[in-house]
Each structure stands twice: as C-alpha cells, then as structure tokens.
C-alpha cells in the first residue's frame, strides 16, 4: 500500500500521477480537513474515489500550541473557578481565547465542578448567617455533597429542594 500525504490542493497533473500509482498498488491519500472540505476538491475527490483511491482525513491541528508559562495556566484555572468565560479570561490576561481554551479544555469540567462546590458552600454559610439553616437543610446539604461528584442531575434536584425549603422557611 502506498501512502501519500497532501497538505495543499493538488493540481490535476498531480492527481493523474496518484492515479497512475494506483495501477501498481493500493493508494491511501491523507489530507487535512481544510483541504478535504475545500470547494475545489469536490470533483477531484470524486474522481479519485472512482479510480479506487482511498481517502483519509487527518484531524491533526496545524501549527504549534502557543506556549504559556505555568503561572498563567494557574491564573486561567483560577479565573474559570471564579466564573469568568474563556473570552473574558483572554481579555484579562491579554492572550487569545483559543489559547485559553487549549489550556482549559482538558480540566474545564473539574474546574466548573469545583466552582459549583464553592457556590454551594457560600450558600450554606449565607443560610447559617441568616439563621435559616435547620437540621433538615443540613441533611439535604450532606446528601448534596455525597452526590455532586458522581450524579449532577440528582445534585441539581437536591439543590432545587434546598432552595424550595429555604423559600418556605
């Protein structure tokens, strides 16, 4: 099998060379998504497929990841926990939102969960200070703490029960 990697839109003479290679052996043509989806490639891809050439789209990112120091990465995580959006964080730190997203996407779920827990604790403290924290609320908060890590839907229902209970109190 012959593998050919292309990173630009091929000319027709280049396509004919690929077709000639097909006469000798199977041909696998690898190209980036941007080239695959380009309007000029529609007829060329159709022609190649008719000639028995296999086409594979590579999803690899082009270029290098922008380097950000560890201190900035920590700041990105702190700002996410505080509730800032990716765009706002980019504006605050003076870096692009795609760079912020690159460094946040792997742990954003955990960071948002941490923010949620922080808000629950603040709400609990607020209720204690206002004198609305009762034993039944304490049980609901304990149940919320136990479920928040593994079942967010159940945690949401418990939180709704807490809010309903506070409004009735």
From Swiss-Prot:
InterPro entries: Homeodomain-like_sf, Resolvase_HTH_dom. It comes from the Archaea. Disulfide bonds: none annotated. Pfam families: HTH_7. GO terms for molecular function: DNA binding; DNA strand exchange activity. Transmembrane segments: none annotated. This is Uncharacterized protein MJ0769.
């Amino acid at each position: 099998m012959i593998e050919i990697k292309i990173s630009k839109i091929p000319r027709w003479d280049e396509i004919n060379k690929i077709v000639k290679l097909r006469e000798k052996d199977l041909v696998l043509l690898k190209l980036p998504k941007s080239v695959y989806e380009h309007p000029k490639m529609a007829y060329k891809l159709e022609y190649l497929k008719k000639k028995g050439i296999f086409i594979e789209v590579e999803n690899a990112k082009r270029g290098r990841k922008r380097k950000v120091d560890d201190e900035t990465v920590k700041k990105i995580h702190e700002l996410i926990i505080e509730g800032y959006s990716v765009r706002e964080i980019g504006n605050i730190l003076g870096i692009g939102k795609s760079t912020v997203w690159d460094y946040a996407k792997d742990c954003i779920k955990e960071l948002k969960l941490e923010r949620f827990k922080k808000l629950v604790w603040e709400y609990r403290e607020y209720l204690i200070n206002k004198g609305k924290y009762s034993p039944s609320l304490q049980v609901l908060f304990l149940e919320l703490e136990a479920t928040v890590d593994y079942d967010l839907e159940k945690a949401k229902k418990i939180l709704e029960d807490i809010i309903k209970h506070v409004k009735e109190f």
